[in-house]
Amino acid sequence: MASGTFVSRGLGLVRNVLLVAAIGTTGLVADAFDVANKIPNVLFAILAGGVLNAVLVPQIVRAYRARNTQERLDKLLTLSGVILLALSALLTAGSSILVALYTGPGWTAPQTSLAVAFAFWCTPQLFFYGLYTLLGQVLNARGQFGPFMWAPVLNNVVSIAGFAAFIALYGPAVTGNVDDLTQWDGTKIALLAGTATLGVAAQALILVVPLWRAGFRWHLRFGLHGIGLRSAGQVALWTFAAVILEQVGVLFTTRFASEAPRAALAQTFGAYRDDPGTLGAVTGLVTGAPDAFSGALAVAGNAAYTQALMIYLLPHSLVTVSIATALFTGMSAAAHAGDLARVRHDLSRGVRTVGVFTVFATAVLVVLALPVTKLLVPSVDAASGEAVSMVLRAMALGLVPLGGMVLMKWVYYAFEDGRTVFWIQVPGTLVLVGVSWLGTQLLPPQLWVVGIGLAMSLSNLVAVGLRTVGLRRTLHGLDGARILRLHVKAGLAALVSAVAGWGVLRAFVVLSGDPADGIYGLSWWQSVVVVAVAGTVMGLVYAGGLKLMRVRELDQLAGPIVGRVRRLVRR
């Protein structure tokens, strides 16, 4: 699973590089597309993602233990598919309303219209994300985890081809006219946004192949009787409410982030919203003198936030999601059987193994934020790279609690306990929105999105703390001493490795001969060298520290990788 995720994320980075090359990371079009492409992801999380994970997996596990397995699966998949299709059609028709929810009053009419056009093409992704989850969970319940993790590879291949075609036809963002909104006709919009949706469709439909080969046939079968939804109704409602609450936080932070560039520009250049013409002063500055104003225009907004979030989630998706997916089906079965010891053991093992990786990943992202940003987003300029990297550092502080938070949430789902998930989400959302809003009041607009990143980290910490308290009661203990001891040891090793990585960065600044510019002016190739050298040094120091402190979880995490490398060498 991790190897599939690794390849997928690698191609995802290539996809992202081409997207940034096409429309940039800051500016009118970048923010408009980011809002539109975020909508189906948010909608899926609200309307399907959480409910499907909370309800579908336990019911599929039960279906495979029942005598009428095929009938139950057919009814579950048919009901879910019909609901997804109807919601997708309805929400696509309401694209303009959705865009209005996620944008602030500072958006001009032309930019809002462009975002609505993008959203009309992007919102149907909701159906295909749902279909991907439905088919993938059937495969997972059968013990076939690989296809679910490899399917996004096809998504990225399709997107890479489409974005490359866009650049070939219309040129890259660096030509300086990407934010000329009068140039965005229907064909140009369809190629960019339609490519994103086509990739998600391919990701979902490819899962039909492994299911067919495994002998599974899905027949349309309507009906609610005998599929366990009566027992799942409560958890579905509570989970739905929890996800709604979570996405309220996303709604507010998106609006805060969308206003940051305009607030910074108004602060620097004065009022511009009522300027005559279709482009406005912001576009005039970008197209007329992009070099002169690049520093002032490179204020982190929605697009920069998304770039930082993409990098931040790489270690999470590579390790945490893979481990959680592998453990969830077994934990659901153990919870159904009342085997608390098995659930407690699996959760402890998952949190400790994930912690070994996320503690180190936090150190790397904090120390190497700027070179990592320039490595993974090669087309970003110096000012935009600095804006993204500052947000990334703030987010990275919440990476460790994020891993534990996700694993613990899935334990609640295994017990079909949506009520507790909801009530724990309340203070988490309040912290996220409250601290983000406080940042807009106390910080300059250039740092609003950094404040959102810090708020997100603090929210993760609050959520994992509350879930720990709740699960300690549910499982009659959490193996807390071992978990805490592991994280303390990993934290000490990561601190030493961070100092070593910082030393490598300082050495590079001295050797570069330009202390004034230093890391800020790194080229892509220099970023490759810095990340490779500093990352290797940090990794060796970290692994050495864990070995000295006899942290066995390192072997559990690295064992499969080492074993595969050895087999390849022997061949």
Where are these regions (language model features)?
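Membrane-embedded alpha-helical bundles of multi-pass transporters/translocases
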Residues: 1-571
